Design a protein with these regions (language model features):
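C-terminal functional module detector
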Residues: 1-243
Length: 243
């Protein structure tokens, strides 16, 4: 019954805890509920406990992100850059995208690297110099990322990312937490460069958001959580119609 009524959430495998409810006036609703109301507002209550530090929490209305919560702040100096390869050619067989990637700084130094969704021990990144690193990976609709911990990279210094799917050239002062994305065709094949703090520590977040309801327009509210290690979780939507 709970499954048929959408009172559940899904994860990519990690046992992420999510407790999400919608409060309209004094009544509480579970994820997946179909709600008709005369109220003008809904309060969305979200609690998340991750199995790894949290990178972001996205609040959706249908396909649209209405807010992104990042439980961390960036330092004044760039310390860590994440380069993400993602997407697929199309649904079904043959969707696999092969990536051949090189990342290079024109100033500063790459001190160390980390990986997300690199499961093949024979396909790990390799340094070619203290300013350049090379790797190969594949995606089939999901994402694969390499984190670079950098030193002395700032201002107009430039990061070059060259791949067989698309290339990027971006100044250090243009790399922020939201990221810069290069679309590469297919079904959401993309290359993204973003900045992260040196270390993420926050695994638990509790927030509440008051959202407006508009007469005759259905809101389809759900929450997506993304951890630093790439694992994600999604709730079923609330379907809320003011009438």
């Amino acid at each position: 019954a709970a499954f048929r009524n959408r009172h559940h959430y899904a994860t990519t495998g990690a046992r992420i805890f999510m407790d999400v409810n919608a409060q309209i006036d004094k009544e509480m609703h579970q994820i997946g509920d179909i709600i008709q109301t005369t109220s003008d507002n809904v309060t969305l209550n979200v609690e998340v406990i991750g199995t790894a530090p949290l990178e972001r929490i996205d609040l959706f209305d249908g396909k649209n992100i209405i807010e992104t919560i990042r439980p961390w702040n960036l330092p004044r100096q760039i310390e860590r850059v994440r380069i993400t390869c993602a997407g697929q050619h199309y649904r079904g067989r043959g969707r696999l995208v092969k990536w051949d990637v090189g990342a290079r700084l024109d100033a500063g130094q790459i001190k160390q690297y980390g990986t997300v969704n690199f499961w093949n021990p024979n396909k790990q990144p390799k340094f070619s110099s203290e300013t350049e690193i090379l790797w190969e990976t594949v995606t089939t609709g999901g994402a694969s990322a390499v984190d670079l911990w950098v030193d002395g990279f700032s201002g107009a210094d430039t990061l070059f990312v060259d791949t067989n799917q698309g290339n990027m050239k971006i100044a250090a002062n243009k790399i922020d937490e939201t990221g810069v994305t290069q679309e590469c065709g297919g079904m959401d094949i993309r290359l993204t460069v973003q900045q992260l703090p040196r270390q993420l520590t926050q695994k638990q977040v509790a927030i509440s958001r008051d959202l407006k309801l508009i007469n005759g327009i259905e809101r389809r509210l759900f929450v997506r959580v993304t951890q630093e290690d790439g694992h994600q979780a999604w709730t079923s939507p609330f379907y809320i119609l003011q009438s």
